Amino acid sequence: LCDRYGVDALRYFLLREIPFGNDGIFSNEALINRINADLANDLGNLLSRSVAMIEKYFGGTLPAQRKAEPLDDELAAMVEALPAKVTACMDVLQVPNALAEIFRVIQRANKYIDETAPWVLAKDEANLPRLAAVLYNLCEVLRVAAVLLTPFLPNTTPKMAQQLGLTAESMRFETLGR
């Protein structure tokens, strides 16, 4: 299984699907469905789209000038609350719930892309500060998710950090909420 799907994907599936200390049901179909839904469609899609848009619209580097809007507040609040939610779940060994919390924010970020339509913003140079804010928010979701997913996906998250151009310091748990 590890050779076919990868250690991180298998570890993620087992931790996401089987509550700690309990028996669980395994099937190849369930494994493939979870990998496709969470890791490929949600996380992979968010990372791929975000990195591609930063490269396409800003040459790989986000400008400092950004224009935030009220639509950003919900996503920012979810990201800010996420480390405490994950920690609370982990404190009582509710690993599947911790992972569900992380992926709830990732799913919200994918919806945020559709709501903010960065490809439309990019058509007008006057919207570039707004576009920068949208892409910054997506990068922050990905950074926080990568930090929180590191214990579960230790081979995957360094690759995410590299694609996002994150420093080792920004990948430390202690940096969350700053």
Regions found by a protein language model. Name each.
Residues 19, 37, 63, 70, ...:
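Proline-rich intrinsically disordered, low-complexity coils
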